[in-house]
């Protein structure tokens, strides 16, 4: 933002001229954040602009209009999800950006209020997620909803039932609403983006966007796979809990089975308040979840009620927002890389700087539109921060330091690897190379084909694939099975033992069950789990190739998006040719039930099994691997086709549905005993 006149210096005419574009800009940013889960600016940019709007309207109250962002909460609930009306509005929160502003807020609250306010505040970490309401009747979860515009939110009941930290049934028959924050842990966010990138899908900008997009899914199975978590922090009807302070309310919620952030603290002085903020300003990078500030609440709940709310925010709480940690550096180059699906992504290469505990020299520029909107040029000095405390990102260009001979960066129109024209597909912001013979895509595809979850060819990594490609030894995955020892001897640092091990690994991969092949082919939207489901259902690649989109979509846990993608892939004549070549070199095309004894096969082969709840004697992954190895198909949802549900601790809606459908249910002890008997 260019240098602006101080609000105190504005004339009414100047204020009026500034207000309209400022409000429109804030509405646009608000819609991106609340409705599209895809903000184009960082929180602090929005916060500063919003703060200026507040100050102008406070100075000229007659210029306030009903649709100003200061008069509304959040954004509209604009999705295909059902709408929920909040009986008690879910308000926004006021914020301050310095310790001085926070001290001033407290002083005004204590001195100017008709209500006596003691220096008795509960401090809580401000979790970077989205607000969530949970309604219980007689102790049972009956509704989950997002904040939306504060009055009307979205019904996400079935989705919240998939979140492990949310109890389905309370230990007391309470009929109450509980509020909190839904978030995505940092580790889950990184893994989700790695998965999406591997499958050619756009990655999320930060954990908050990922959490919002995951919670607002139409399909609860998608939400379940995203590893969301929650921290609850508020009960509108606190008297029903028998508590008198915010700290007591948090402990009561913990006793009821909710996840409550343990890092809250009651403070009684400005020194204690400052110490807490300074402590978590330093610790925030080490936390397994994102925080973007500290929330200060009047600890006494009766005082909270007496203070009440403005039209938009409570008077009894305020958020202290962390200043963004930024470092200035210089952009030296912009590299363009081609992914397995042809997506061409720009990356800024910069002078190394220390940022949030790590050395950073590269930052993704996401897509060409982002690069153009930010007007990033070679030689520019830029401010760098970590989005969601994780991903290095350029905040802005420091225009004053731009070289005099600077020129706008020209986005390439041809693929940096093969020279083919780059295109936008289906209104995507990404640029794609659609040349099926693009070397970069083929090499990425070869690496994916050989990866552990695909054909599992040990020893065949990207560097060796690069050498094989450069020597002209492979042009597609079928060529891997035509490699001979004499060819490999020409590669540097390749001895007889290495060659023998690699050829053995390649030969062994011929005999994989076909779900590994399906995943290895790199079909859009087909991860390892989907490949397993398709293989178990159709039994062979040929049968899957012959199926239409509707038939594939009807498979349990698949759906129309995946069904269309798979059917479209197998309609391609080049794919038919590749499958024929793979058959020619002896690659198995059938689903192979694991080699087991007659007793084992009778017990597990072909069974559809669902795992639910927390397992204590093994991880869910270990249980799934054991079952799959014995021919069982492990699915994510309960249906009439399910043969067995294995229920761990705190099993919820899946257990209820299985019991309703009359499906056999085992607890973990029985499953553990069955494993011991077979092993």
Swiss-Prot record:
Catalytic residues (positions): 126
Q: What Pfam families does the database record attribute to this sequence?
A: BRCT (PF00533), DNA_ligase_aden (PF01653), DNA_ligase_OB (PF03120), DNA_ligase_ZBD (PF03119), HHH_2 (PF12826), HHH_5 (PF14520)
For the ligand (NAD(+)), the binding residues are 43-47, 92-93, 124, 147, 181, 297, 321
Q: Which UniProt keywords apply?
A: DNA damage, DNA repair, DNA replication, Ligase, Magnesium, Manganese, Metal-binding, NAD, Zinc
Reading the lineage from the top rank, the first entry is Bacteria
Enumerate the PROSITE patterns for this protein: BRCT, DNA_LIGASE_N1, DNA_LIGASE_N2
Q: Please list the residues that bind Zn(2+).
A: 415, 418, 433, 438
Query: What chemistry does it catalyse, as a reaction equation?
Result: NAD(+) + (deoxyribonucleotide)n-3'-hydroxyl + 5'-phospho-(deoxyribonucleotide)m = (deoxyribonucleotide)n+m + AMP + beta-nicotinamide D-nucleotide
InterPro entries referenced in this protein's UniProt entry, alphabetically: BRCT_dom, BRCT_dom_sf, DisA/LigA_HHH, DNA_ligase, DNA_ligase_AS, DNA_ligase_CS, DNAligase_adenylation, DNAligase_N
In short, the EC number is 6.5.1.2
Q: Which GO terms describe its biological process?
A: DNA repair; DNA replication
Q: Where is the BRCT domain?
A: 599-679
What SMART domains has UniProt attached to this entry? BRCT, LIGANc
Q: One GO CC term of this entry? A: cytosol
GO function terms (MF aspect): DNA ligase (NAD+) activity; metal ion binding
Query: Does the record bear Cytoplasm in its keywords?
Result: no
Q: What does this protein do?
A: DNA ligase that catalyzes the formation of phosphodiester linkages between 5'-phosphoryl and 3'-hydroxyl groups in double-stranded DNA using NAD as a coenzyme and as the energy source for the reaction. It is essential for DNA replication and repair of damaged DNA.
What HAMAP family does the annotation carry?
A: DNA_ligase_A
Q: Which family does it belong to?
A: Belongs to the NAD-dependent DNA ligase family. LigA subfamily.
**NCBIfam families given in the database record:** dnlj (TIGR00575), PRK07956.1 (NF005932)
Name listed for the protein in its UniProt record: DNA ligase
Which source organism?
Limosilactobacillus fermentum (strain NBRC 3956 / LMG 18251) (Lactobacillus fermentum)
């Amino acid at each position: 933002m260019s240098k602006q006149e101080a609000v105190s210096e504005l004339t009414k005419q100047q204020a009026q001229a500034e207000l309209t574009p400022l409000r429109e800009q804030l509405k646009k940013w608000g819609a991106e954040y609340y409705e599209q889960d895809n903000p184009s600016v960082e929180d602090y940019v929005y916060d500063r602009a919003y703060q200026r709007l507040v100050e102008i309207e406070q100075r000229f109250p007659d210029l306030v209009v009903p649709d100003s962002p200061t008069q509304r909460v959040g954004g509209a609930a604009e999705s295909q999800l059902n709408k929920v009306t909040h009986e008690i509005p879910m308000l926004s929160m006021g914020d301050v950006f310095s310790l001085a502003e926070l001290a001033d807020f407290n002083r005004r609250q204590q001195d100017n209020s008709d209500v006596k306010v003691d220096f008795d505040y509960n401090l809580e970490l401000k979790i970077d997620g989205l607000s969530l309401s949970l309604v219980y009747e007689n102790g049972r979860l009956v509704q989950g909803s997002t904040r939306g515009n504060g009055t009307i939110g979205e019904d996400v009941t079935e989705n919240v039932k998939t979140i492990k930290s949310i109890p389905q049934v309370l230990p007391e028959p309470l009929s109450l609403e509980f509020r909190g924050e839904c978030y995505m842990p940092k580790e889950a966010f990184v893994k989700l983006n790695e998965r999406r990138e591997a499958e050619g899908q756009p990655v999320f900008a930060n954990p908050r966007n990922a959490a919002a997009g995951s919670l607002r899914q139409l399909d609860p199975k998608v939400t379940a796979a995203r590893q969301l978590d929650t921290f609850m922090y508020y009960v509108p009807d606190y008297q029903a809990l028998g508590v008198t302070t915010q700290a007591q309310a948090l402990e009561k919620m913990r006793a009821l089975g909710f996840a409550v952030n343990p890092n809250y603290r009651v403070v009684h002085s400005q020194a204690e308040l400052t110490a807490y903020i300074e402590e978590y300003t330093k610790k925030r990078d080490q936390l397994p979840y994102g925080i973007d500030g500290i929330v200060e609440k009047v600890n006494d709940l009766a005082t909270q009620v007496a203070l009440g709310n403005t039209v938009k925010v409570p008077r009894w709480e305020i958020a202290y927002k962390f200043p963004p940690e930024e470092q200035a550096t210089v952009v030296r180059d912009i590299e363009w890389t081609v992914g397995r699906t042809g997506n061409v992504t720009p990356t800024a290469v910069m002078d190394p700087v220390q940022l949030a505990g790590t050395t950073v020299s590269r930052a993704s520029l996401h897509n060409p539109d982002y690069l153009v909107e930010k007007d990033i040029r070679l030689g520019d000095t830029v401010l760098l921060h970590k989005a969601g405390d994780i991903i290095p990102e350029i905040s802005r260009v420091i225009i004053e330091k731009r070289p005099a001979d600077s020129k706008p960066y020209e986005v390439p129109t041809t693929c940096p690897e093969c020279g083919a024209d780059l295109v936008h597909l289906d209104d995507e912001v990404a640029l794609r190379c659609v040349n099926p013979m693009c070397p970069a895509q083929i090499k990425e595809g070869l690496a994916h084909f050989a990866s552990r979850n695909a054909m599992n060819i040990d020893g065949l990594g990207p560097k060796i694939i690069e050498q094989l490609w450069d020597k002209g030894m492979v042009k597609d995955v079928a060529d891997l099975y035509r490699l001979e020892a004499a060819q490999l001897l020409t590669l540097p640092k390749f001895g007889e033992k290495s060659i023998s091990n690699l050829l053995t690994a390649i030969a062994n991969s011929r005999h994989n069950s076909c779900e590994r092949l399906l995943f290895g082919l790199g079909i859009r939207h087909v991860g390892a789990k989907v490949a397993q489901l398709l293989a178990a259902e159709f039994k062979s690649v040929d049968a899957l190739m012959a199926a239409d989109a509707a038939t594939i979509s009807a498979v349990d846990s698949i759906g129309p998006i995946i069904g269309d993608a798979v059917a479209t892939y197998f309609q391609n004549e080049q794919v038919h040719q590749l499958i024929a070549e793979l058959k020619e070199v002896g690659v198995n095309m059938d689903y192979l039930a694991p080699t087991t004894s007659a007793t084992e096969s009778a017990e597990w082969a072909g069974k559809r099994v669902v795992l639910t709840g927390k397992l204590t004697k093994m991880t869910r992954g270990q249980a799934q691997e054991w079952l799959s190895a014995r021919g069982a198909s492990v699915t994510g949802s309960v249906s009439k086709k399910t043969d067995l549900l294995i229920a761990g601790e705190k099993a919820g809606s899946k257990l209820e549905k299985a019991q309703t459908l009359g499906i056999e249910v085992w607890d973990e002890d029985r499953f553990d005993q069955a494993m011991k008997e077979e092993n």
